[in-house]
Amino acid sequence: MVDARLPDGSRVNAIVPPLAIHGSVLTIRKFARDPYTMDDLVGFGTVTPKAGQFLAACVRGKLNVLISGGTGTGKTTNLNVLSSFIPDGERIITIEDAAELQLQQPHVINLEARPPNAEGAGEVRIRDLVRNSLRMRPDRIIVGEVRGAEALDMLQAMNTGHEGSMTTVHANSPRDALSRLETMVLMSGYDLPVRAIREQITSALNLIMHLDRMPDGRRVVTALTELQGMEGDTILLQDIFKYRTMPGDGRLDGELVATGLRPKFLDRLAEVGVEIPAKAFRPPAPTNGAATPARLRTAKVPKMSTLARPERAR
């Protein structure tokens, strides 16, 4: 069994008998030569233009974002796209188990964890890299995925001046993502009360972007959810955008629409000069017919690059 990386950045996994009972298996995970943009995600039907502009504003306004979803839903791809809206002047540190992010800014430091050798020595964990990154004067920390105790260090980094940081987590819903984070923080070895963990989470995170994979293979954003604080021992969540399904063409179709609720963090964005027009949160008029499929509807939208992408330094 081996896990390796090719010169072009592709990931290779190979497993042979007797571990692979019916014969050797070689898996190659290739990446796009040119990183996807928000225009691409809109064209794929992953996100709507309104939601795309909202996400770009959240990144420029240095909100802390958690991307959640199941396996193969496009979490890393969307993390890479959101990271493209970080201004060029900021110092960014990326931390991954296996390097996949393709940030194009000039001040990016890429760190990669290292597994132990055959003798069980030499391991460098994601958690070790997160802790070390705090000594490297980052403006933002991007962790490819939190799977264990490093969740606590990531939350603490978000709470100690590293605003605008982002990461991903495997989860089935925004609420499930918070439960997963709680479990991972408890894996850190610190005997923290559950309420203290939840307060840490609500203080650190501003927005959850949740992705799902549709039965036809499309990957779509199904919720953009704000964390609004605590009520008793419960974390309050509010959907700003929500995927609305409607029957059409013999299968479920739908679109990501505004719920009509304005996020509390708008004032914070305004303080740093990032404005989101009120019409972005206006819900669509109710319709009696089926929703227009996102993959068809998005073919006529304007380019996001002229609306939301920050200027690159020349």
Predicted regions and their residues:
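NTP-binding/hydrolysis catalytic cores, primarily Walker-type P-loop NTPases
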Residues: 217-314
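P-loop NTP-binding catalytic core
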Residues: 1-61
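Hydrophobic anchor at the beta1->P-loop junction of P-loop NTPases
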Residues: 67-69
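P-loop NTPase switch/communication element
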Residues: 31-43, 60, 80-131, 155, ...
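Walker A (P-loop) phosphate-binding loop of P-loop NTPases
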Residues: 72
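Conserved lysine of the Walker
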Residues: 75
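Conserved P-loop NTPase nucleotide-binding/switch module
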Residues: 96-109, 133-232
